[in-house]
């Protein structure tokens, strides 16, 4: 992994520590499903714009003037960890949106979003994250990544448990959303969610507020997905089972209720050098009355 120069002394100091720390998060997993898109997912929009490798290990979505495309997991889940490797659109990608997310698909839906907002050639992608809880959203954060996400595959992860939601890029935490339900803050905790991905035309808003439109002469636009892992509680109608702590539900254990010391340092590094928008800093948007969670601890 190549990081910006100003961070290199930090990387050298903690490189070994973060690897050791992150292995703890991964090593306790008992994989629910891993690898075959044909077995674990189904196409939800425009099958002609979805291409899956013969072995089912990789899948691409295509966007052209006719259509975008999407797919969804067959199962739904209540808590767990989801990892997906993604390679974004190269070159002129302005106006395009690649989304990877979990959603309950209900009117008052819960949703946990990664949205990759394309840009003109030579300008960086914006990664927007969002959390819907009981139908309420407006919780966007945006960062610039420290690498070119269209050059190679990178792993984007969601850890969702009874304590917190952690968004991760290559196992580095970039955003936290804690369960402050006891203080009146909505948190996704009752609705099972499917894992979904899509590629679509977002030129009305995605790049510079809709100023930069899709250049269709550069299409078709292709995003690639692969090497996913779903280690989560499969929904069978039993909320108490998925809420519990057990060997299978490792993510709910107390050790995953907050970040480790090393992860906190990485999180602060991302916030300092790569954060470009945080709804909790947008006083104008909320008429100087920020959402309650903005005044509560992040970890």
Swiss-Prot record:
GO terms for molecular function: hydrolase activity, hydrolyzing O-glycosyl compounds; polysaccharide binding; xyloglucan:xyloglucosyl transferase activity. Contains at least one intrachain disulfide bond essential for its enzymatic activity. Disulfide bonds join 233-242, 280-294. The active site is at residues 111, 115. It catalyses: breaks a beta-(1->4) bond in the backbone of a xyloglucan and transfers the xyloglucanyl segment on to O-4 of the non-reducing terminal glucose residue of an acceptor, which can be a xyloglucan or an oligosaccharide of xyloglucan. Residues 1-29 form the signal peptide. It is an enzyme of class 2 (transferase). Xyloglucan binds at residues 115, 128-130, 138-140, 204-205, 209, 285. It holds the Pfam family Glyco_hydro_16. The keyword Kinase does not apply. It is found in: Secreted, Cell wall; Secreted, Extracellular space, Apoplast. It comes from the Eukaryota. Its main location: secreted. Keywords: Apoplast, Cell wall, Cell wall biogenesis/degradation, Disulfide bond, Glycoprotein, Glycosidase, Hydrolase, Secreted, Signal, Transferase. CDD domains: GH16_XET (cd02176). GO terms for cellular component: apoplast. Glycans are attached at residues 51, 238. The record marks 113 as: Important for catalytic activity. Catalyzes xyloglucan endohydrolysis (XEH) and/or endotransglycosylation (XET). Cleaves and religates xyloglucan polymers, an essential constituent of the primary cell wall, and thereby participates in cell wall construction of growing tissues. Belongs to the glycosyl hydrolase 16 family. XTH group 1 subfamily. This is Probable xyloglucan endotransglucosylase/hydrolase protein 10. It comes from Arabidopsis thaliana (Mouse-ear cress). The gene is XTH10.
């Amino acid at each position: 992994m190549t990081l910006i120069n100003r961070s290199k002394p930090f990387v050298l100091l903690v490189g070994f520590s973060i690897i050791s720390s992150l292995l703890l998060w991964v090593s306790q997993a008992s994989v629910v499903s891993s690898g075959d898109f044909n077995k674990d997912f189904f196409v939800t929009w425009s099958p002609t714009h979805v291409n899956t490798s013969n072995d089912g290990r990789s899948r691409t979505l295509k966007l052209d003037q006719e259509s975008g495309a999407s797919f969804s997991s067959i199962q739904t889940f209540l808590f767990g960890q989801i990892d997906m490797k993604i390679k974004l659109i190269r070159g002129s990608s302005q106006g395009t949106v690649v989304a990877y997310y979990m959603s309950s698909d209900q009117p008052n839906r819960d949703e946990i979003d990664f949205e990759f907002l394309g840009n003109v050639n030579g300008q960086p992608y914006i990664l927007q994250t969002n959390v819907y809880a009981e139908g309420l959203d407006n919780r966007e954060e945006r960062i610039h990544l420290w690498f070119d996400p269209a050059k190679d595959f990178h792993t984007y992860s969601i850890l969702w448990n009874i304590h917190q939601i952690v968004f991760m890029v290559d196992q580095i935490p970039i955003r936290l959303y804690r369960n402050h339900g006891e203080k009146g803050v909505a948190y996704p905790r009752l609705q099972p969610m499917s894992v979904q991905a899509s590629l679509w035309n977002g030129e009305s808003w995605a790049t510079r507020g809709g100023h930069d439109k899709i250049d269709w002469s550069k299409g078709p636009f292709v995003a690639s997905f692969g090497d996913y892992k779903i280690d989560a509680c499969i929904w069978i109608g039993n909320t108490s089972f998925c809420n519990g702590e057990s060997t299978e539900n490792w993510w709910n254990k107390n050790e995953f209720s907050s970040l480790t010391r090393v992860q906190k340092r990485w999180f602060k590094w991302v916030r300092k050098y790569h954060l470009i928008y945080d709804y909790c800093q947008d006083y104008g948007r909320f008429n100087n009355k920020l959402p309650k969670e903005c005044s509560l601890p992040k970890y």
